[in-house]
A protein has these predicted regions:
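Short glycine-rich substrate-engagement loop in P-loop NTPases that contacts/grips substrate
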Residues: 154-166, 208-246, 262
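Short, charge/polar-rich alpha-helical segments
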Residues: 1-44
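Pre-Walker A (pre-P-loop) alpha-helix and adjacent loop at the N terminus of AAA/AAA+ ATPase modules
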Residues: 136-186
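Walker A/P-loop nucleotide-binding motif
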Residues: 182-199
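Interdomain "pre-motor" coupling segment immediately N-terminal to P-loop NTPase/helicase cores
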Residues: 87-140
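Loop/turn-to-beta-strand initiation segments
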Residues: 184, 212-213, 246-249, 278-284
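Conserved alpha-helical scaffold flanking the Walker A/P-loop in AAA+ ATPase domains
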Residues: 174-178, 225-250, 266-274, 300
């Protein structure tokens, strides 16, 4: 999964802090117990000396295997003596052990060269946190997408807005369940407050849980940041071009609300075209109709969307207004 360098660095930093904290706490416990049980100091000195002797044995002994086996036997006996001493004084035999947040990998993030589950879960949490800073990701699930808010009346032989919403929800659940880096791109259309963002974020929730990297943002914010990056204005950027082009799933919300100029149009086309070429899925939402898109952008952008994306149109009344 192609997480950003920032996400990897943040996860590794958390692991490093966990390990450092566990090590310091273990040292504090050791100092406290050694002060209460002086015999522990004697055992620790003997164990340290055995460690040095084992190292020397490789270079000085005529029978290194025999001597190392003997030293290891002495070490095991001392370790057993230490456990018994702790028990005798009312402590568990592992009272001096380092208590890692993740005992499986000892807070390194890796087991036999492969990512530990704790590292994977950290990456997921960081992806989720980034989106939750700007959008209600936790609230937007398929379970909370209520189609009862859509009108149930059908006109001119068409299906009702409610039935349409139910079908789109079913399609989105299926899409999210089977999501991969090769999934098709989606294009949500419909008026304000009809659930386009909700469904996009519901898919994001599932994709993140499956271990995929996700970037969510409005067209205005993403294209604005990319324009600033292009002109060297690098302070406070949330989005960078290489991450936008490479992320497993890009969600571009509210297309058409951005400040339009020659650069943003060119940048938008590059995002759409590059990700189509790389077979990476993108979810775009807009309040515009296809005709309005043609008027606002050019034929190149609209034709790439209509030709390569699955079009999903929600109808009805502004749900946010109804909920009030």
């Amino acid at each position: 999964m192609s997480y950003s360098i920032e996400t990897y660095d943040k996860a590794q930093s958390i692991l490093d802090r966990r390990k450092e904290k566990a090590t310091l706490e273990a040292q504090d416990r050791a100092d406290e117990l050694c002060a209460k049980i002086p015999e522990l100091n004697t055992i620790n000195r003997k164990l340290a000396q055995i460690g040095l002797n084992i190292s020397k044995t490789f270079f000085t002994s005529q029978n290194p295997k025999e001597d190392i086996d003997r030293l290891r036997t002495e070490s095991l006996a001392l370790q057993e003596e230490k456990k018994n001493l702790l028990k005798k004084n009312g402590y568990g035999e592992n009272a001096l052990a380092i208590k890692y947040t993740c005992p499986a990998c000892e807070d390194t993030g890796f087991i036999n060269g492969r990512r530990c589950k704790c590292f994977i879960n950290l990456l997921k949490d960081i992806e989720r946190e980034k989106i939750e800073k700007i959008a209600p990701l936790e609230e937007c699930t398929f379970e909370t997408f209520n189609t009862e808010y859509y009108p149930n009346n059908a006109e001119n032989g068409e299906i009702s807005p409610r039935r349409r919403a139910e079908k789109i929800k079913e399609n989105c659940i299926r899409y999210a369940t089977n999501f991969s880096k090769n999934s098709k791109s989606l294009f949500f259309m419909g008026g304000t407050g009809l659930g386009k963002t909700h469904l996009s974020l519901a898919i994001a929730n599932v994709a993140i849980n499956k271990g995929y990297s996700v970037i969510y943002g409005t067209a205005q914010n993403i294209l604005g940041d990319l324009q600033n990056e292009n002109f060297g204005r690098l302070d406070n950027l949330k989005y960078r071009e290489n991450e936008i082009l490479d992320v497993d799933l890009l969600i571009l919300d509210d297309l058409g609300t951005e400040f339009k100029n020659a650069y943003t149009v060119s940048c938008l086309y590059n995002i759409i075209n590059t990700r189509i070429g790389a077979k990476l899925p993108t979810i775009i939402s807009t309040n515009y109709t296809i005709k309005e898109l043609l008027d606002f952008y050019d034929q190149r952008i609209t034709s790439r969307i209509t030709g390569e994306y699955s079009l999903l149109t929600l109808e009805g009344n502004d749900i946010r207004y109804i909920k009030k």
